[in-house]
Amino acid sequence: MTARSRPGYFRQEINKTIWEVPDRYKDLKQVGTGAYGTVCYALDRRTGAKVAIKKLHRPFQSDLFAKRAYRELRLLKHMKHDNVIGLVDVFTADLSLDRFHDFYLVMPFMGTDLGKLMKMERLSEERVQYLVYQMLKGLKYIHAAGIIHRDLKPGNLAINEECELKILDFGLARQTDSEMTGYVVTRWYRAPEVILSWMHYTQTVDIWSVGCIMAEMLLGKPLFKGHDHLDQLMEIMKVTGTPSKEFTAKLQSEDARNYVTKLPRFRKKDLRILLPNVNPQAIKVLDGMLLLDPESRITAAEALAFPFFSEFREPEEETEAPPYDHSLDEADQSLEQWKRLTFTEILTFQPAPAVAESKETAL
């Protein structure tokens, strides 16, 4: 069903909801749906580019939902890097604040993600180098803004057929009680300090995740595949070794300190034995990432300088984002205030100059 709506817009029913979209976008097809929104593929008539349009599910049903929607919009507006997903466009068909109920985020359409790619084929060392290099460039940029991803995994690393990678869902992930129990795939890439809430964590939680993802790319299977959060910790310590007394003393929680001191003793394993036939330069990168003590892990900027990435390295592309002001979206606001702020962000969006697509961008 399609019908006319606001001038310059058209209406279309997708997944039992009405979408109101500018005429510049055509051929809408649903490609995904989740807890917070539905995503459609579309073609941008203006540039010829393939795009992904996300409609949030009832973004203003509560002040919590409104806060989340505002934060997602602001984060996407802030990001301007080839390896981090950013906004092509943002729009609403609602003409005034009192009628404002829905808005749509437009992003580049990538086609697949690393999780799907790894299921389809074993990746060559050269592709691992190129993909991890892009992950680290994206993380250096995000971390410079003062943002921690918190939930890096193969499924939110989008890839197109040119093997270009963009990080998705940065800064939005929040740990919940439901994620701490059961068989959750995400856990396989989580840093130990996040799994057990050991301490106030830093940007190096993302470096741990990259180490897990890189090891899986080289090994062909997850490195740490625990059945619950305690089993996950045991799997990790079989490789990293049991924490030192110095590290245990840093744990803020007395319960965590007591728990760790009662664990079986494990000796640190040599990654060269776990990943035989892997380039020693790749092992050096993993050795710097997969350390139990977050303070000892390498940063994204340090990792980029490792010889393993020298073939693809272009330091001028390793840029840093300007600082992101967290105070705006952590403020205590009413639902109406969040709506007003979001509406203003949409009206003030400045798109990048349009560049026509010269190549396919979907896998």
Swiss-Prot record:
Modification Phosphothreonine, positions: 181
Motif range (TXY): 181-183
Parts forming coiled coils: none
Annotated binding of ATP, by residue: 31-39, 54
Activity regulation information from UniProt: Activated by threonine and tyrosine phosphorylation.
A single Gene Ontology CC term: nucleus
Residues of the active site: 151 (proton acceptor)
Required cofactor names: Mg(2+)
Compartments in which it is found: Cytoplasm
Post-translational modification: Dually phosphorylated on Thr-181 and Tyr-183, which activates the enzyme.
PROSITE patterns: MAPK, PROTEIN_KINASE_ATP, PROTEIN_KINASE_DOM
Catalytic activity: L-seryl-[protein] + ATP = O-phospho-L-seryl-[protein] + ADP + H(+); L-threonyl-[protein] + ATP = O-phospho-L-threonyl-[protein] + ADP + H(+)
The keyword ATP-binding is assigned to this record: yes
GO biological process, one term: intracellular signal transduction
Residue stretches making up the Protein kinase domain: 25-309
GO MF annotation: an example: protein serine kinase activity
Modified residues annotated as Phosphotyrosine in this record: 183
Keyword terms of this UniProt record: ATP-binding, Cytoplasm, Kinase, Nucleotide-binding, Phosphoprotein, Serine/threonine-protein kinase, Stress response, Transcription, Transcription regulation, Transferase
Major location category of this protein: cytoplasm
Family recorded in the similarity comment: Belongs to the protein kinase superfamily. CMGC Ser/Thr protein kinase family. MAP kinase subfamily.
Function: Serine/threonine kinase which acts as an essential component of the MAP kinase signal transduction pathway. MAPK12 is one of the four p38 MAPKs which play an important role in the cascades of cellular responses evoked by extracellular stimuli such as pro-inflammatory cytokines or physical stress leading to direct activation of transcription factors. Accordingly, p38 MAPKs phosphorylate a broad range of proteins and it has been estimated that they may have approximately 200 to 300 substrates each.
Domain notes: The TXY motif contains the threonine and tyrosine residues whose phosphorylation activates the MAP kinases.
PANTHER family for the chain: MITOGEN-ACTIVATED PROTEIN KINASE (PTHR24055)
Protein name: Mitogen-activated protein kinase 12
Organism the protein comes from: Danio rerio
Record lineage: Eukaryota, Metazoa, Chordata, Craniata, Vertebrata
